């Protein structure tokens, strides 16, 4: 670190936070660690994790940052660990609303009909993300809207399970398993509804990006997702039951007034709280003051 003239070590991997804080301390430079999610410890390791946090902060002078209200509260209330809250961010030059002409042009490019009702999820396939819940309700959704399509972006440990479930339910031709995509906005702007069914999040960056594209969001009411409605109604928060997805989608399709309000509130909120230039400046100040 001294040889390369490093001024700050910013660590994101939880298993490295104490080690990197020690390295920074020995090198006489500043260190920052970012908590990205609402972690919980097993009873046997709880006190150890509290000690790691306390010693890194008080003995090694590491500054702790959290990315959302839920993560901040989790650290403060569960681990008795005060942190500096600086929200995550998105780039508004990469994620922005589409007009009708662009939406239809991209739908044509992707082979999606003008009158299709498109739902989308974006994220790695895992037990935490619970994409199974979305697939399970497709038969019920198709009873009301036969031209429905589910754009499934992401892959991971449960991808094959999800494909097997789709075949079992006979809805595989209504799902496009797109895997990981670089041009996520292209898929967001052709969608009518964004879904996130996680057990928990730190803060969902893909939800921020969807709201920035003015796509209405239906979210499970869990830590890291309920943050989006902390100030006002910016999404539809629903209980953690797949059947609630059907009710929420029907509500958005039949109540245009509430849908437009959610879109407006969500867009204004992410531009205010998760705007890249503003939050990056806060990170830079943290580096200078750490």
Q: Where would I find each of the regions flagged by the language model?
A:
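Short hydrophobic beta-strand element within catalytic cores of glycosyltransferases
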Residues: 216-219, 229
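Conserved acidic donor-binding segment of nucleotide-sugar-dependent glycosyltransferases
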Residues: 231-243, 251-257
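A short, active-site helix/loop in glycosyltransferases that binds the activated sugar's phosphate group
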Residues: 59-85, 89-97
């Amino acid at each position: 670190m001294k040889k390369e003239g490093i001024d700050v070590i910013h660590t994101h991997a939880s298993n490295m936070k104490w080690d990197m804080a020690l390295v920074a301390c020995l090198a006489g430079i500043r260190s920052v660690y970012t908590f990205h999610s609402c972690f919980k410890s097993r009873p046997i390791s709880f006190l150890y994790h509290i000690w790691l946090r306390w010693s890194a902060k008080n003995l090694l002078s590491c500054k702790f940052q959290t990315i959302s209200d839920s993560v901040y509260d989790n650290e403060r209330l569960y681990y008795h660990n005060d942190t500096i809250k600086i929200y995550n961010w998105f780039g508004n030059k990469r994620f922005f609303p589409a007009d009708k002409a662009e939406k239809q042009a991209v739908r044509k490019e992707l082979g999606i009909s003008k009158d299709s009702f498109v739902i989308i999820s974006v994220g790695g396939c895992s037990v935490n993300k619970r994409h199974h819940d979305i697939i399970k309700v497709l038969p019920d959704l198709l009873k009301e809207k036969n031209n429905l399509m589910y754009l499934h972006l992401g892959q991971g440990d449960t991808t094959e399970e999800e494909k097997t479930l789709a075949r079992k339910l006979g809805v595989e031709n209504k799902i496009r398993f797109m895997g990981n995509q670089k041009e996520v906005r292209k898929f967001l702007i052709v969608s009518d509804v964004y879904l996130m069914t996680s057990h928990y999040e730190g803060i969902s960056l893909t939800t921020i990006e969807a709201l920035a594209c003015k796509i209405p969001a239906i979210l499970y009411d869990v830590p890291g997702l309920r943050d989006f409605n902390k100030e006002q109604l910016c999404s539809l928060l629903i209980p953690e039951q797949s059947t609630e997805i059907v009710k929420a989608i029907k509500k958005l399709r039949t109540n245009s007034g509430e849908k437009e309000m959610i879109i407006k509130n969500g867009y204004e909120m992410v531009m205010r709280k998760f705007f890249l230039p503003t939050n990056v400046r806060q990170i830079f100040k943290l580096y200078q003051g750490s």
